[in-house]
């Protein structure tokens, strides 16, 4: 908690914005949130991805709050200071979108702009399908809007990758990836946060897919130094939190693909009419298998795609000034009522 407060405070030291950290009971769980900005400002919810925390938005919170938005950034369920339910089905997309709606209810707001990264982007893109009346705008970072597949994601991945290794399939077996990551949280996080870029050589790419008993972390390159966007204090904060909580809650998000497929079979809205923005990085390995060319099958309202040259997966931490500029420009066009 102390590191968390100090980390956010460092980013806000030159502003008049004072963030508030509090616990909120919503949708059957307790979420730790960081909140900043005027209480009567338009609400913007920042939803982080795997393996991150509300802390991953440390560069966006002050910029958005200073622009007059009421910013709410939760540690999502399974992470950080928030509840970590034991049942795997407690992490399905119905529950995850329900958490964001619960934060809106707690804030007394009818609608919000949802901004998500990685898994948080999946939740952000799904919320206007399940709760269309609560979403004024939606932005996804690193994961674009994609149509519901004909079969569950895991079925498609098994057909595509066969006996090859693929991390999403490896994450399916409860306890396996958990044990690997929990054994050395610092090594796990340093490799995931520091090594998740599009491989520059074919051997590295093939290693990520090679069959065998080797786990996920061992396949990632070990960076010889931290990336420029990640300080030693930043890494220490992530390590402290995941050392305390473990990775099981976070990994349980991946174990609900089949449930999510069922839940999204009959959405309240078939498409997204709210203004939408996707921002990706040209060096993001996730975009090698998550294509951006089917967005218009999902989004029928105003839509814009931005690709940042040379950016990797952790885009809001890597390119904070560019991301902030894009988000502020996008939000300035939103009709909030």
What is each residue range found by the language model?
Residues 17-18, 29-31, 43, 79-115, ...:
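Flexible "cap/lid" subdomain of the alpha/beta-hydrolase fold that forms the substrate-access gate
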Residues 22-26:
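Short acidic-hydrophobic surface loop/beta-edge motif
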